[in-house]
Amino acid sequence: MKKIAIIGAGISGLFIANLFKKDPNYQITIYEKNISLALDQGYGVQLSVNSIRILNKIGFRKFENNEKFTPEKINFYSNENSNKICDLDITEFNSEDCKYTTLKRSSLINFLKTDLEGMIKTGYNI
């Protein structure tokens, strides 16, 4: 069995741990410097269609629909005078199972850590 140490329990570290976890030949440990995972409610993230495609490899399809939003367009505004510049129809980039998505960072972290119990070691400095 190969041992893998992942430094950081952020979105990327938790995602790659989920990928490695699929292979029983790997023993994974995630080292996080903070004493707990940052689950502040206020931060939002936007996930492109390509991001959703790779998240689907670890079961993102089963993520609760009431915790995510799939907008149909993005509006762009001038920073100088707040006038709308244009909008972008993002549904053109979507497929049936991969849609541009927004959600709380804390919701994504909770999803990513669900199957990693016992693998995350907090309070470690490298």
Where in this protein do the model-derived segments appear?
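Active-site loop of classical SDR/Rossmann-like NAD(P)-dependent oxidoreductases
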Residues: 43-47
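Glycine-rich FAD pyrophosphate-binding loop
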Residues: 19-41
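Short, solvent-exposed loop/turn segments at secondary-structure junctions
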Residues: 11-12, 35-36, 52
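Beta1/beta-strand and adjacent pyrophosphate-binding region of the FAD-binding site
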Residues: 1-12
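A secondary-structure boundary/capping signal
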Residues: 7, 31-33, 122
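Conserved N-terminal helical subregion
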Residues: 4, 48-126
